[in-house]
Amino acid sequence: MSRLDSFITRMQAQRDGLNFLKDKVDGLPGPILEIGLGNGRSYDHLRQLFPGRDIYVFERKVAAHPDCIPPDDRLFTGDVQESLPRAARQLGQRAALVHTDLGTGEHEAHMAMGVWLGPSIDLLVGPGGYVYSNQPLAVARWEQLPNPPGVPADRYYLYRAR
């Protein structure tokens, strides 16, 4: 698969998965978390799906389109290994949805990231909350769910906290 095709597949998986989760998340209390702002596309999509909902964003260094940058009080900057525990102290374990699209472009490093990322996210996701991740995450209190329709296996992973 070309890099362009891979990018398009990833973007479709993001959109389709977030759209699939909209009705499920609407009935849950708590904020939405976007881990990895990048260019701000999925954050912008989350704002459209969940108007009026608190959306907190995590990004090492913001370089997104100006229209897609969250307000300062909803933005955690710096290394995500440090900002996730900081956010957990501030927000608690109550997120209704956590969407993460982090990666290094290198398979082994990407998989290693998932080892610490899952437990870090678990500090934030509330009971019954959803985690939609571009990497496999192993957390004991989460149940892995089937992927949303149209989302290829091993492209994204869907979990629900117990």
Feature annotation, model-predicted:
Residues 1-30:
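Class I SAM-dependent methyltransferase Rossmann-like catalytic core
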Residues 28-38:
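Conserved class I S-adenosyl-L-methionine
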Residues 29, 94-95:
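Local beta-strand N-terminus motif with an aromatic residue
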Residues 40-44:
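Glycine-rich SAM-binding Motif I of class I
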Residues 54-59:
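Conserved SAM-binding motif I beta-strand of class I
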Residues 108-162:
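C-terminal substrate-binding/active-site "lid" region of AdoMet-derived donor-dependent transferases
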